[in-house]
Amino acid sequence: MFSALRHRTAALALGVCFILPVHASSPKPGDFANTQARHIATFFPGRMTGTPAEMLSADYIRQQFQQMGYRSDIRTFNSRYIYTARDNRKSWHNVTGSTVIAAHEGKAPQQIIIMAHLDTYAPLSDADADANLGGLTLQGMDDNAAGLGVMLELAERLKNTPTEYGIRFVATSGEEEGKLGAENLLKRMSDTEKKNTLLVINLDNLIVGDKLYFNSGVKTPEAVRKLTRDRALAIARSHGIAATTNPGLNKNYPKGTGCCNDAEIFDKAGIAVLSVEATNWNLGNKDGYQQRAKTPAFPAGNSWHDVRLDNHQHIDKALPGRIERRCRDVMRIMLPLVKELAKAS
């Protein structure tokens, strides 16, 4: 294990439906991501795991990758989650998730995985449904159409760039029901694939939060943290972009580490991760759950799963220009970072 970990660190250190037309390059960083995010949120609301909307959105993303020239396919998996009725009776809901994968081949067998979950929240109880949490009309602009948009723009801008290490773009399913798609992805990986995976980057909830955060996994070695998280923060500073890392004010979440997303699955398996999100770790329980100060536009200080709040119309009104600006900022950080880590020619 130690030798494999050392190998990954050394390898990274060396590198320091509806179809939209795919253009050679976006005029400005973030434009393509913004367009894609709005399209996905508008035309594929209610992307709950196993629903027709999720299947259609998965096929749309696959077609976008193929238009860019990538080999891309959809992998389905069967899973289930518990639903709690009003009388507290619990029952299993069976689902078939759809995960989209596209491959950017490198010269070496090592790879970097860039992930964003495509599913939106499905009500897990009658109480959720009563509170307008999840369901057929949830756009999920923040959670997580914007993450998908950024991933697609990274793929678009890297499609003709030779890299030493391969890059796999993955739109996961089932994140909202317990990281089901990420679990299935890891389960399908061979021991060799796991060993050759230098880093998993997860893009999630990029818009509503006060500022960008770059967090490592609990098990990510310090040397890799410096090459990934700390390097991302340095790039952000060079562009005057407000970005930081978890300050560690909650003892359950150590300084510089993240929580509660698909990256956790890989972190627990001993694979280095970098979580990219927008929130405010200084508020509430200081666990990253409260994204911003409580206001009439965001009464609980977040937009989590709320049909009325997590849509581009509400966000545009409450936070004018935020979607475009945040897509641009994330791209200005992530594109050079990924090029460095993958050793782009």
Swiss-Prot record:
Binding site for Zn(2+) 2: 143, 176
Keyword Zinc among UniProt keywords: yes
Entries under InterPro entries matching the protein: M28_fam, Peptidase_M28
Gene Ontology cellular-component terms listed: outer membrane-bounded periplasmic space
Record's keyword terms, sorted: Aminopeptidase, Hydrolase, Metal-binding, Protease, Signal, Zinc
Enzyme class: hydrolase
Known function: This protein, presumably an aminopeptidase, mediates the conversion of E.coli alkaline phosphatase isozyme 1, to isozymes 2 and 3 by removing, one by one, the two N-terminal arginine residues.
Protein's recorded name: Alkaline phosphatase isozyme conversion protein
Provenance organism: Escherichia coli (strain K12)
Underlying gene: iap
